[in-house]
C-alpha cells in the first residue's frame, strides 16, 4: 500500500515511517524544504518536499496514496505564537483531509494529543470522552485541530481517525521534542528537582504501532489514546536516576517556584538564543495529572510496553547524541536496561538498512 506521512522527519513521523516500512508499505515522506532529514537517513521511503499550508504541494504528494498519516505539527512551548500554532494545526489538517479526498485515499489518521482530553487536579484517569479544560496555546491548537479535521472529513466523506499519544519518548528526535527534553532537563539540573502531578509515559515505537493499528482497524470519527503507564513525577524522576546512575530527586518544587524558575530560564534563553530547560507554559502544568486510559486502543490490539522501557529507549538514544554533552555523559552510569535498549535499537536500524540495500 502506498502511504503518505506528513511531518515524516519528526519524533512520531520518523518512527511511524519505520513501522510502515517494516510492514511492507510503500512510504512517501512529506517534509518541508531545508528540513533536518537525519531521522530518515538510509530509509527506502520516498522524500517529497512541500508544506502542509500549501494545499497544492500536499495534494501532489498524496497523489496515488491510499492512506494518509497526518503527523505534521508544531510541538513547542517556546518561540511560537498562539496564532502560529493554531494555523499549522487547523489549516494544515484541513489541507491534509482535502488532499486525501483529491487523491482518492480512503482514510486519514490524525496525530492529535492526549492533552485534548484535559487534565485533573487529582490523580484520576481520563479517557477519550473526558472534556477539554486546558488553557495553554499548544493544547488549544490541538483541540481546534481535531474539531476542524473531523468536520472537514465528514463534509468530504473521508474516514478520519484521531490518535492521542501520551508523552512520547524515544529515538530519532534530532530537534529534541519537549517530551525527550524532560529527561535531558532532569539530568542537567544540579538541584535534581521533582514536582507534584503526573503524566502518561509511552515509547514512541509503541505510538508508531498504534498509528498503524488505527489505520487498519480504527473506527472513523473516533479518537484513541496511545499511552502506557500513568506515573507521578517523583516516580518518573527516580526511574530516570536509576536507569542512568545519577542522583534521585532532592526536593519537590511547588507551582510558584517552578513558574519563577521557568521565567528565569526564558530570560536566559532570550540572551543565549538556546531553548530554555522549561517554560512558563510548562510550569503551569505542575501539580496537574495528565493520566489517561488506553483501553479503547487495546481493542485494536495495542499493547504498549512499560514506562521504564520507554525511558530506557530514550536514554539509550539520547546518550548517543549531542543532546547529552560529553561531560554530563561521563558522569552517568547507565544500567543494563539502557545498554539492552541500545542493542535493540541498533538491531532494528540494521534490519531496516539491510531491507533498503536488498
Regions found by a protein language model. Name each.
Residues 131, 181-202, 206, 210:
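A conserved pocket-lining segment of Rossmann-fold NAD(P)-dependent short-chain dehydrogenase/reductase
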Residues 3-25:
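N-terminal Rossmann NAD(P)H-binding glycine-rich loop of SDR-like oxidoreductase domains
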Residues 135-137, 166-175, 192-205:
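Glycine-rich "substrate-gating" loop/helix at the edge of Rossmann-like oxidoreductase active sites
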Residues 135-161:
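Active-site Tyr-X1-5-Lys
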Residues 210-280, 299, 307-358:
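Mid/C-terminal beta-alpha module of Rossmann-like enzyme folds, strongest
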Residues 34-91, 99:
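NAD(P)H-binding glycine-rich loop region in Rossmannoid oxidoreductase-like domains
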Residues 70, 74, 82-138:
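Conserved Rossmann-fold NAD(P)-dependent oxidoreductase catalytic core, especially the SDR/UDP-sugar
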Residues 156-158, 170-181, 214-224, 246-248:
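Glycine/proline-rich active-site loop of Rossmann-fold NAD(P)-dependent oxidoreductases
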Amino acid at each position: 500500500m502506498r502511504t503518505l506521512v506528513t511531518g515524516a522527519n519528526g519524533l512520531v513521523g520518523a518512527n511511524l515511517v519505520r513501522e510502515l516500512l517494516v510492514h511492507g508499505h510503500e512510504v512517501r515522506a512529506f517534509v518541508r524544504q531545508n528540513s533536518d532529514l537525519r531521522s530518515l537517513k538510509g530509509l527506502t521511503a520516498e522524500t517529497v518536499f512541500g508544506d502542509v499550508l500549501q494545499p497544492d504541494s500536499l495534494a501532489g504528494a498524496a497523489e496515488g496514496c491510499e492512506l494518509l498519516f497526518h503527523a505534521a505539527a508544531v510541538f513547542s512551548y517556546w518561540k511560537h505564537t498562539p496564532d502560529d500554532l493554531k494555523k499549522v494545526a487547523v489549516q494544515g489538517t484541513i489541507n491534509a483531509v482535502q488532499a486525501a479526498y483529491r487523491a482518492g485515499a480512503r482514510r486519514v489518521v490524525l496525530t492529535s494529543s492526549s492533552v485534548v482530553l484535559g487534565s485533573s487536579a487529582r490523580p484520576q484517569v481520563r479517557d477519550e470522552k473526558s472534556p477539554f479544560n486546558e488553557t495553554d496555546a499548544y493544547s488549544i491548537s490541538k483541540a481546534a485541530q481535531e474539531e476542524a479535521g473531523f468536520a472537514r472529513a465528514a463534509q468530504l466523506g473521508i474516514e478520519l481517525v484521531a490518535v492521542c499519544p501520551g508523552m512520547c519518548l524515544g529515538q530519532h528526535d534530532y530537534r529534541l521534542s519537549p517530551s525527550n527534553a524532560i529527561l535531558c532537563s532532569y539530568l542537567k539540573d544540579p538541584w535534581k528537582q521533582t514536582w507534584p502531578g503526573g503524566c502518561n509515559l509511552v515509547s514512541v515505537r509503541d505510538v508508531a504501532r498504534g498509528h498503524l493499528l488505527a489505520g487498519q482497524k480504527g473506527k472513523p470519527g473516533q479518537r484513541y489514546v496511545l499511552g502506557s503507564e500513568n506515573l507521578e513525577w517523583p516516580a518518573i524522576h527516580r526511574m530516570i536516576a536509576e536507569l542512568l546512575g545519577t542522583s534521585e530527586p532532592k526536593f519537590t518544587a511547588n507551582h510558584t517556584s517552578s513558574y519563577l524558575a521557568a521565567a528565569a530560564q526564558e530570560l536566559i534563553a532570550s540572551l543565549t538564543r538556546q531553548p530554555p530547560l522549561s517554560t512558563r507554559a510548562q510550569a503551569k502544568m505542575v501539580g496537574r495529572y495528565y493520566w489517561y486510559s488506553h483501553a479503547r486502543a487495546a481493542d485494536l490490539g495495542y499493547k504498549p510496553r512499560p514506562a521504564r522501557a520507554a525511558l530506557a529507549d530514550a536514554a539509550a538514544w539520547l546518550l548517543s547524541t549531542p543532546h547529552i554533552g560529553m561531560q554530563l555523559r561521563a558522569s552517568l552510569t547507565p544500567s543494563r536496561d539502557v545498554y539492552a535498549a541500545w542493542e535493540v535499537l541498533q538491531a532494528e536500524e540494521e534490519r531496516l538498512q539491510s531491507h533498503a540495500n536488498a
